[in-house]
């Protein structure tokens, strides 16, 4: 087994966060009274609205800015955001779906081996930081991709990046480094 051999790694996307604007003022009280699956947080000035399909939660501000979380793909996030805009239109608001952007993608990937974290950190010092007293994972940052990886000794890697492509590229880039520090099977 070598680092160059093609190993199929399953990257499971667990959360996609997106943001969009409605280009109109939203009356939060009206949304809270007439909308479905709504929680009104008056003290912080926002409304939480949940959709069942796709399963997303939206945070709505009166300025018209909406943040959607919980989607499992970029396409699902856009579909859910459009459904949310449509439901606001049905409540009587002059919603125009604009400035849609995926801002964060969270994914999990399992390596087919365990990793020696102290050795990995020593070999990749400027990018990797490991504080076992504070957190059981190595924090590895790839500035060019704006991605952060949490690498656990079990071989599980949690990747946070700006889009799905950056997450996949980050896993491809980190594989040879974690392969060097894998635990030998007895």
UniProtKB/Swiss-Prot annotation:
Give the subcellular location: Cytoplasm; Nucleus
**A Pfam family for this UniProt protein?**
TBP
Name the tissues where it is expressed.
Ubiquitously expressed.
User: Which protein are we looking at?
Assistant: TATA box-binding protein-like 1
Q: What interactions and quaternary structure are annotated?
A: Binds TFIIA and TFIIB.
* Lineage, highest ranks first: Eukaryota, Metazoa, Chordata, Craniata, Vertebrata
Any one of the GO BP annotations = acrosome assembly
Q: Please tell me where this protein is predominantly located.
A: cytoplasm
Assigned keywords, A-Z: Cytoplasm, DNA-binding, Nucleus, Transcription, Transcription regulation
Q: Which family does it belong to?
A: Belongs to the TBP family.
> What functional role does this protein have?
Part of a specialized transcription system that mediates the transcription of most ribosomal proteins through the 5'-TCT-3' motif which is a core promoter element at these genes. Seems to also mediate the transcription of NF1. Does not bind the TATA box.
* InterPro entries, per database record: TBP, TBP-like, TBP_dom_sf
UniProt-recorded Gene Ontology molecular function terms: RNA polymerase II core promoter sequence-specific DNA binding; RNA polymerase II general transcription initiation factor activity
**Phenotype reported upon loss of the gene:** Significantly reduced NF1 levels.
Gene Ontology CC, one term: cytoplasm
Q: Which organism is it from?
A: Mus musculus
């Amino acid at each position: 087994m070598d680092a160059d051999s093609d190993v199929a790694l399953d990257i499971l996307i667990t959360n996609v966060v997106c943001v969009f604007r409605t280009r109109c003022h939203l009356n939060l009280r009206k949304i809270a009274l007439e909308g479905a699956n709504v929680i009104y947080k008056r003290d912080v000035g926002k409304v939480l609205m949940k959709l069942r399909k796709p399963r997303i939660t939206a945070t709505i501000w009166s300025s018209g800015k909406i943040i959607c979380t919980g989607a499992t793909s970029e396409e699902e996030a856009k579909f859910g955001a459009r459904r949310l805009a449509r439901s606001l239109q049905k409540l009587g608001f002059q919603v125009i779906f604009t400035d849609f952007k995926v801002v964060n993608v969270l994914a999990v990937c399992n390596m087919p081996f365990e990793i020696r974290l102290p050795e990995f950190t020593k070999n990749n010092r400027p990018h990797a930081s490991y504080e076992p007293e504070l957190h059981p994972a190595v924090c590895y940052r790839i500035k060019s991709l704006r991605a952060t990886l949490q690498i656990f000794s079990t071989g599980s890697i949690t990747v946070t990046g700006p889009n799905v492509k950056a997450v996949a590229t980050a896993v491809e880039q980190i594989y040879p480094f974690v392969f060097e520090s894998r635990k030998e099977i007895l």
